[in-house]
Amino acid sequence: MKLKKINKFQISIDGGGSTGTSTGGKLISKKYGLTFLSSGLLYRYASYQIIKNKPKNKILFIKKVFKNLTLKKLNKINLHTPEISRHTAVIAKIGNVRKILKNFQINFAKKNKKCCIEGRDISTVILPKSDLKFFFKCDLDVAARRRYRELKRNSNQIKFLEVKKALRIRNKLDISRKNSPLLKHLDAIEIDTGKLGISSMVKKMSKEIDKKIKIIYGS
């Protein structure tokens, strides 16, 4: 059901690494005609640009890069390399970097009234007034297997235990950082994606979305 007659509907999805937030967000966005943005990709893109250009002043550089960033540019590059993953965990803790990316996401939401944004702090910081909030959780082993399969496509040198360790560390950093930690919003609907296949996950999300649309718009 596309939301053609509806002027505004915004969904926020939060969750730890490889819990399925990106997959769920993309599929739901396609189904309902929403513009999709992955917060994680923004941080990965920032890491990619820093690794590639080695700027002296990282903050000013990132500010400049994100002034001209489009979704087309963001989705054009492979941002899921181990090097970018390691670097992303570090820059995600920097307050000024988070501020720049926060402003980018807020402006994105202002321009795109019908959108879905996924990340770690979307419901709590970026879109606290989103129409519907989801929080994904998943067993670490299941999440690590997903990430391992994803990374394996680009490199045969990837080891499962290393992926699992990196994911555990990243989740710990996300939960414990002072700036915008990963938290479940009080209004968020929790979905355990470790126990669901992709179609079941989308079905569960769709049920909640349809219910919310009916409450807000009466149809």
Which residues does each predicted region cover?
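ATP-dependent small-molecule kinase phosphotransfer cores
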Residues: L41-K114, D121-T124, D141-R145, L161-K178, ...
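NTP-dependent small-molecule kinase module
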Residues: M1-I6, L79, N103, Y148-N154, ...
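Phosphate-binding loop of NTP-binding sites
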Residues: Y32, T124, P128-S130
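Pre-Walker A (Motif I) flank of P-loop NTPase domains
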Residues: K5-I11, N112-K113
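Short, well-ordered beta-strand core segments
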Residues: C115, D131-F135, A188-I191
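Post-Walker A helix-loop "phosphate-sensing" segment adjacent to the P-loop in P-loop NTPases
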Residues: S29-S39, K52-P55
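Short, well-ordered alpha-helices that flank and scaffold nucleotide-derived cofactor binding pockets
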Residues: K26, K30, Y48, K52, ...
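Glycine-rich phosphate-binding P-loop
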Residues: S12-S29
